[in-house]
Amino acid sequence: MAIVKCKPTSPGRRFVVKVVNKELHKGAPHAPLIEKKSKSGGRNNNGRITTRHVGGGHKQHYRLVDFRRNDKDGIPATVERIEYDPNRTAHIALLCYADGERRYIIAPKGVSAGDQLIAGALAPIKAGNSLQLRNIPVGSTIHGIELKPGKGAQIARSAGASAQLIAREGVYVTLRLRSGEMRKVLAECRATLGEVSNSEHSLRSLGKAGAKRWRGVRPTVRGVAMNPVDHPHGGGEGRTSGGRHPVSPWGFPTKGAKTRGNKRTDNMIVRRRK
């Protein structure tokens, strides 16, 4: 994987920084594992905007990624290829199991075409193998972690993400997440060894607004640039700073206000994130 800084041959190329991976598959995705992906433009069934800054973008197919891997225990799989996935920041790996079935998984860092992976309690401690947390050594780096047994991976799925298993006590294990949060998870839950691929994703620079539009992201307008009818920071004579602590268009505090409201699982958090 290489970081390529483009030459300023035009204003749109001047600030472009690309992440180039020559191992990525250049052809079409595996057809049985793709589905139609319709765009909402950020609107709900009433046609009203419920998510701002969404709309347009290139047509995409959704890749069906296996986040569970619990029904292939003990069946070895060969990595056929590593692919780009427009639906996530991480790359995906196409596995061919010994029984002939093919599935996509989140590609772990260091895994390449031809590698052998396996899931299950007897799987060796090797990047890309999937085990229950009770069978993973303390101190291991993991990703694709379940919060409920059998539900599928929910934590550490984006590019370069990982967590560390730091303790095991009774039916729970303790994880340290990248955010600094330490939380307990049932030892029956599964995780994949290693960290997620494409860790250089954060180093890229799109270089121009149009590249963001290709990805379906619309502009973000500042509140102080609006009229009073549109935003609490709007209006005023000349340029103003908003005149109050930063709030959302609906008046709720932004920039640091705590939004977590799931009291039911508070007892699972040993230490809040930094």
Curated annotation (Swiss-Prot):
Cellular component GO terms, alphabetical: large ribosomal subunit
Name of the gene this protein is made from: rplB
Classification via Gene3D superfamilies: 2.30.30.30, Nucleic acid-binding proteins (2.40.50.140), Ribosomal protein L2, domain 3 (4.10.950.10)
Entry protein name: Large ribosomal subunit protein uL2
Quaternary structure and partners: Part of the 50S ribosomal subunit. Forms a bridge to the 30S subunit in the 70S ribosome.
Keyword rRNA-binding attached: yes
Stated role: One of the primary rRNA binding proteins. Required for association of the 30S and 50S subunits to form the 70S ribosome, for tRNA binding and peptide bond formation. It has been suggested to have peptidyltransferase activity; this is somewhat controversial. Makes several contacts with the 16S rRNA in the 70S ribosome.
Record HAMAP family: Ribosomal_uL2_B (MF_01320_B)
Listed GO biological process terms: cytoplasmic translation
PANTHER family assigned to the protein according to its UniProt record, in alphabetical order: LARGE RIBOSOMAL SUBUNIT PROTEIN UL2M, RIBOSOMAL PROTEIN L2
Location of the region described as Disordered in the Swiss-Prot/TrEMBL record: 28-55, 224-274
Family: Belongs to the universal ribosomal protein uL2 family.
Highest taxon of the lineage: Bacteria
Keywords linked to the UniProt accession: Ribonucleoprotein, Ribosomal protein, RNA-binding, rRNA-binding
InterPro entries, sorted: NA-bd_OB-fold (IPR012340), Rib_uL2_dom2 (IPR014722), Ribosomal_uL2 (IPR002171), Ribosomal_uL2_bac/org-type (IPR005880), Ribosomal_uL2_C (IPR022669), Ribosomal_uL2_CS (IPR022671), Ribosomal_uL2_dom3 (IPR014726), Ribosomal_uL2_RNA-bd_dom (IPR022666)
Organism of derivation: Pseudomonas putida (strain ATCC 47054 / DSM 6125 / CFBP 8728 / NCIMB 11950 / KT2440)
Disulfide bonds: none
Coiled coil spans: none
Gene Ontology MF, one: transferase activity
Entry keyword annotation includes DNA repair: no
